[in-house]
Amino acid sequence: MSKVLAMILAGGAGTRLEPLTRERAKPAVPFGGRYRIIDFVLSNFANSGVYRMKVLTQYKSDSLNNHLSRAWRMTAFLGHYVEAVPAQMRTGLDWYKGSADAIYQNLNIITDEEPDYIFVFGADHVYRMDTRQMLDFHCTKKAACTVAAIPVPIEQGREFGIIDVGPDGRMRQFLEKPKDPPPMPGNPKMCLASMGNYLFSTDVLVQEVVRDAANEASAHDFGKSIISELYKRAPVYVYDFAQNEVPGQEAKERGYWRDVGNIDVYYQSNMDLVEVDPTFNLYNDRWPIHTQPNNYPPAKFVFADEQNHRVGHAMDTLVAEGCIISGGSVRRSVLSPKVRVNSYSEVEDSLLFENVTIGRRCRIRRAIIDKNVEIPPGMTIGFDPVEDRRRFHVTPGGVVVIPKGMKVT
């Protein structure tokens, strides 16, 4: 069997997710109540049988490193591991200059591991994928590099790096946010957008990052600097993610992929989960999303005084372990562990991170409340845009964001 290594890029600053990334790396941002964003790519590899994973970290990585050490302990004596690799300045006094430079600065890992193939994936996307199918495609095509791509409506192609492919799937051109995107073969209404996930034959990857490092004018980015040149001189193929089949996945879920690059997209991706029949279903035990186990008690709902409107209940909501809904109402929301909603309060269309407390008689709507925040009794959030902007961060889509540990008065 071929030796495969996954190198996961988790060193980006994640500035577009501020203030959620003010104290943590983007891949460590909570998602879906009990997960971190990075859990999705790691689960995809583990479920695919790829058990050697190096996570390249850099900015504000403490929370991410803690999560990896607690949630991703694998069977070391079988050679299985998930290891965080902090930026070490092995090639000079510079941090990572880009995604390609992150690999270049860690070529020692490749030398030590001696893999035949290397996955280079991002750590900040939400999706399910059987990566072995991409490897099979790569080997069948005898590709130097394979790029995962997702079909998007052609009118949205201006927002992505778009790939022009031939009928055999070989890349003919890579275009960054083109005004006139080329359609994908056989479907003039769709085009192929790069997912930022790559698979290389090892010798090709090493050769290309060394070549890129010698170019002082390079952006040292895989899409802009490596792929945009490699396809001109080597067989680069495009793997259509929409063809990927995951056990237990319904047809409507195939091709679900979200780049949660800004808060409005991140918010909506969480809201996707609370639908009665969600497009992305967390409840697929044939392809589970793994994360840190905890010893919190079950969620609890207390008080049923309907006459005085003091009924603890939640509808169309994900409620994690350790939560207590104490006479409050929660609708269309996602609650992380140890959240408490007190009597007579109403929470709607919101994300409450771990250890958030909502005092009595509060009204919360379309808000993201980060970890360790206490909302005092009687507070109203999400109903007065002017007042919300005066006190908090409000996104272009109108979502109110309260940072981790903020003292709300």
UniProtKB/Swiss-Prot annotation:
Pfam families: Hexapep_GlmU, NTP_transferase. Keywords: ATP-binding, Carbohydrate metabolism, Glycogen biosynthesis, Glycogen metabolism, Nucleotide-binding, Nucleotidyltransferase, Transferase. It comes from the Bacteria. PROSITE patterns: ADP_GLC_PYROPHOSPH_1, ADP_GLC_PYROPHOSPH_2. Belongs to the bacterial/plant glucose-1-phosphate adenylyltransferase family. HAMAP family: GlgC (MF_00624). Involved in the biosynthesis of ADP-glucose, a building block required for the elongation reactions to produce glycogen. Catalyzes the reaction between ATP and alpha-D-glucose 1-phosphate (G1P) to produce pyrophosphate and ADP-Glc. This is Glucose-1-phosphate adenylyltransferase. It comes from Myxococcus xanthus (strain DK1622).
